[in-house]
From Swiss-Prot:
It catalyses: 2-deoxy-D-ribose 5-phosphate = D-glyceraldehyde 3-phosphate + acetaldehyde. This is Deoxyribose-phosphate aldolase. GO terms for molecular function: deoxyribose-phosphate aldolase activity. Catalyzes a reversible aldol reaction between acetaldehyde and D-glyceraldehyde 3-phosphate to generate 2-deoxy-D-ribose 5-phosphate. Pathway: Carbohydrate degradation; 2-deoxy-D-ribose 1-phosphate degradation; D-glyceraldehyde 3-phosphate and acetaldehyde from 2-deoxy-alpha-D-ribose 1-phosphate: step 2/2. GO terms for cellular component: cytoplasm. It comes from the Bacteria. The active site is at 89 (proton donor/acceptor), 153 (schiff-base intermediate with acetaldehyde), 182 (proton donor/acceptor). It comes from Lactiplantibacillus plantarum (strain ATCC BAA-793 / NCIMB 8826 / WCFS1) (Lactobacillus plantarum). It is found in: Cytoplasm. InterPro entries: Aldolase_TIM, DeoC, DeoC/FbaB/LacD_aldolase, DeoC_typeI. CDD domains: DeoC.
């Protein structure tokens, strides 16, 4: 297993400086991580350094609350694509999910998926498992698959907890092999990373990438 190719090397802290972003980019290039995941402001800067490499440029959309209007999420996605992004990790409208307004949740996702897929970009969808019941995790995962996104993702890393093996098992059970499953938030060691993969995760969002690969 090439564990490094499971990793989205992530720096989403609001106080992240250009110097810190550049360090993450260097680490990703040296270790061939799957992508560098940043906030939208940094996409153009990161893409300029990663273009032509085997490391993708990724960013978050509607982050971290997911409570933006769909139009704003779409505009943010379009800007990121113009700036050179390869993968978009959007946050669902969590309140609408918990309010059982499933059509609204799916339409919000589909709008970003359409923009992403039209430009041949990967779209991952964060459901924020920390705020959901088991039943809501399953339902949200099904909605994400029905919206034709590429991955369902556990967490922003900004809520009450990150991913758990239980979350991943529920999500994988819901989507089977229809779409990928991404675990993110609170994964700090190789053993934790492998446990997520064993449970069904096909991508990991981590800031502790260097520790996970033993560097």
């Amino acid at each position: 297993m090439k564990l490094n190719r499971y990793l989205d090397h992530t720096l989403l802290k609001p106080e992240a400086t250009e110097q810190q972003i550049d360090q993450v980019v260097r680490e990703a290039l040296e270790n061939h991580f799957y992508s560098v995941m940043v906030n939208p402001y940094w996409v153009k800067h990161v893409h300029a350094q990663l273009a032509g490499s085997d490391v993708a440029t990724a960013c978050v959309i509607g982050f971290p609350l997911g409570a933006n209007t769909t139009a704003i999420k779409v505009a943010e996605a379009k800007q990121a694509i113009a700036d050179g992004v390869d993968e978009l990790d959007m946050v669902i409208n969590i309140g609408e999910l918990k309010g059982d307004h499933y059509d609204a949740v799916q339409q919000d996702i589909e709008s970003v998926v359409t923009v992403g897929h039209t430009a041949d970009k990967v779209v991952k969808v964060i459901i924020e498992t920390a705020l959901l019941t088991d039943g809501e995790i399953v339902k949200a995962s099904e909605i994400v698959a029905d919206a034709h996104a590429d991955f369902v993702k556990t967490s922003t890393g900004f809520s009450t907890r990150g991913a758990s093996v239980h979350d991943i098992s529920l999500m994988k059970g819901a989507v089977q092999d229809r779409i990928g499953v991404k675990a993110s938030g609170g994964i700090h060691t190789r053993d934790e990373a492998l446990a997520m993969i064993d449970a069904g995760a096909t991508r990991l969002g981590v800031s502790a990438s260097m520790a996970i690969i033993g560097k």
